[in-house]
Amino acid sequence: LMVSGSKECRLWLMDTAGIGGDDHRTDVYTTPAFCNEDVNFASAGIWGSLATWLDKQGNRWVLSPFWGPQHSKFKFPITNGVTKRGGVAAFKVQEVNGKIELVPAWISRDMDQGEPPVIANGVVFAYGSGENTDQAYYDVGLADVASRRIPNSTHAVLYALDAQTGKELWNSGTDIKSWLHNGELSVANGKVYIGTFDGMLYCYGIAK
């Protein structure tokens, strides 16, 4: 099986033995849209890569970053506050009535443009990029230009979440002074690394 995401904020579960089926358009399962209710393809939807992990009970998890608020019609069994700017959504790959589905598990706290997470030792490391992703404005219309986007960007925040519930365990607060564009985290030797637009590399680890 493989999973892909889309800017309309759906996940698509496919069989790698025949992706798309005989008609090249049939998947195993498609989630309803869990964000991007306003169909905003600039500042909402899934823009980053997915993550997956296998827990001790043998459950396969799929985690998706997303931008924008949670869809009002989509319900997660575990929530962690109101999600307005983005976050991480977690699903389990499970058999339901004889068919394989992506079953919603939890949604994270609000993050300023949720970006791709990494899972290590039962902890989800995720971040909000702080980037201004607007591409059109009421005063000038379409204006996807650095002169507008950079000044309106803020700063990234790194989060540690419980992988089973999405509960926040820690965040970097205002430590990180800049934002980033389509970046990825790295986790190695008990440390988490995140780079930012201003050329800085931040490293976090457990205090000894």
Language model regions located:
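Extracytoplasmic/lumenal domain signature
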Residues: L1-K208
